[in-house]
Swiss-Prot record:
Annotated Pfam families: Homeodomain
Top-level taxon in the UniProt lineage: Eukaryota
Protein name: Homeobox protein MSX-2
Residue stretches of biased makeup (Low complexity): 69-84
Family: Belongs to the Msh homeobox family.
Amino acid sequence: MASPSKGSDLFSSDEEGPAALAGPGPGPGGAEGAAEERRVKVSSLPFSVEALMSDKKPPKGASPRPADSASAGAALRPLLLPGHGAREAPSPGPPGKPFEAASVKSESAEDGAAWMQEPGRYSPPPRHMSPTTCTLRKHKTNRKPRTPFTTSQLLALERKFRQKQYLSIAERAEFSSSLNLTETQVKIWFQNRRAKAKRLQEAELEKLKMAAKPMLPSGFSLPFPINSPLQAASIYGASYPFHRPVLPIPPVGLYATPVGYGMYHLS
């Protein structure tokens, strides 16, 4: 027969067995310990609010898992909506002032990284250049309007200009009174007509020079002017008593002999 002390020991051991296997019950001390352990784990993440505020680098040995880092980066990455600016996605964390400071800091860092990585996506809007205004030459305010000459007046002025380009004071006064014009109008018309005649004369001289220019092959030039009488006399010989007209010299390739010896013979 067992003693009472031994029986009590067996009874106590039987009650402690299931309790030891089940573990500590959900008491107030156990809940606080689990919450404290979870908070420590969250604060150890490099992307947590506490880590961003303290700017502490994680140890070299402990590197976060790829899934945790990817989820944390996606939580802090700003949302890009068409037509709106960058908005930060709500990230889990304890509310309060520390969360606001951390959100501002992460937003500035992520915005800078996004601008550096994708410059084409965040290009500034094109500038709308205003059309360049063409500045016209402004005439004088006191400028007199042009005189509308009639056909009969223009014919009389042209006829008088062909007779005499410069009119005296008496001739101008008489001529202007016959055309019902002022002396100033007649004077200005004659000045403009003389300038026009000079321009036409210069243009005609330029055309004559271009027509009289000899047709020489490209790359061929003479060391002397063709129209010079002294050089022409040296070509044809000094014994000629008169100057012969100078003809255009044909290209050198047509004759085997030197220039000038194919058509003319020296005396």
